[in-house]
């Protein structure tokens, strides 16, 4: 939803001569849409979460919105890696994200839970009590996913570093229509 088909448009319009122009244009559009959707979910988190029947869990919705926004935003740099035929880097970054997500889920949902409960490594309880609250529950799944997705930024930094926010309605129209 956050990429609204722009990944496909990037492949269609980004040739070797003008890939930078379309990269900036399309990534700018995806960042703007992701920002707007995320802002909507942040501003209306309370009524939306109440409507869903999970009052008091606004943080879940905010983290979910941020995860989806980051997924949308990094889709274009990933498309650029594919266009530039860099499969090893693409695979490395994707696998690093998956591995970090799994490790963080194990850390929060098993390791911290068990230390908090006093099952082992009780000397770590003071530290774990600061970072782990059992009542947060499934929120740790969202948190792990958010942290893992934030790791995309340093892993893809060179693709963000040369990005320049750009919007040209005339150039964007055919991209949007595609």
Q: Language-model segments: which ranges?
A:
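Alpha-helical transmembrane segments of multi-pass membrane proteins
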Residues: 1, 35, 39, 53-77, ...
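Interhelical loop/hinge segments that connect adjacent transmembrane helices in multipass membrane
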Residues: 115-144, 151-178
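Alpha-helical transmembrane segments of multi-pass membrane transporters/permeases
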Residues: 21-24, 61-66, 81-109, 115-125
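Residue-level recognition of pore/gate-forming positions within transmembrane alpha-helices
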Residues: 34, 68, 98-102, 145-153
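Interfacial transmembrane-helix starts/ends
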Residues: 15-32, 176
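Membrane-interface junctions at transmembrane-helix termini in multi-pass inner-membrane proteins
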Residues: 12-18, 70-94, 160
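Small-residue-rich midsections of specific transmembrane alpha-helices
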Residues: 1-15, 30, 68-76, 151, ...
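Short membrane-interface helical motifs at transmembrane helix boundaries
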Residues: 36-58, 114-129
